[in-house]
A protein has these predicted regions:
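PP2C/PPM-type serine/threonine phosphatase catalytic core
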Residues: 1-134
């Protein structure tokens, strides 16, 4: 969530480096090797990756409820391919630099992630919280 004064990360990063996720995975018979599930996947929750479902990978998300007040401008939904290469300040800067070109914002974010060397799957959705829909 972004406005001109603050950036707020409101989701839980479900990664194999998280102690709670490690414990959950190991209880389900999985192994963390080199901070990856079965040595393959850095995230601990995912759609797909069916070969790891019996090793502790689940698709159940953490859900966060957030009151959206009038001060918030944008909500960025992005994959770990974006977040592993760009931080909140990077995304905020890109967002407000491209405010007059909203339709291009997600493309610019994903291109910047690629420029920073991300080789993971990269996807991004930008939600304009100020736009009124009638």
């Amino acid at each position: 969530m972004f406005n001109r004064k603050k950036n707020e990360f409101i989701t839980t990063e479900d990664k194999c480096t998280d102690d709670k996720e490690k414990i959950r995975i190991e209880k389900l018979g999985g192994q963390i090797i080199d901070d990856r599930l079965d040595g393959k996947l850095a995230i601990s929750r995912s759609f797909g990756d069916y070969d790891l479902k019996n090793k502790g990978l689940i698709c159940e998300p953490h859900i966060t409820k957030k009151f959206i007040d009038n001060s918030l401008n944008y909500c960025i939904l992005a994959s770990d391919g974006v977040w592993d290469s760009l931080n909140l300040d990077d995304i905020s800067k890109i967002t407000f630099e491209n405010e007059n070109n909203f339709d291009n914002m997600a493309k610019v974010i994903t291109q910047k992630a690629m420029q920073r060397g991300s080789e993971d799957n990269i996807s991004c959705i930008v939600v304009d919280l100020k736009k009124k829909i009638y």
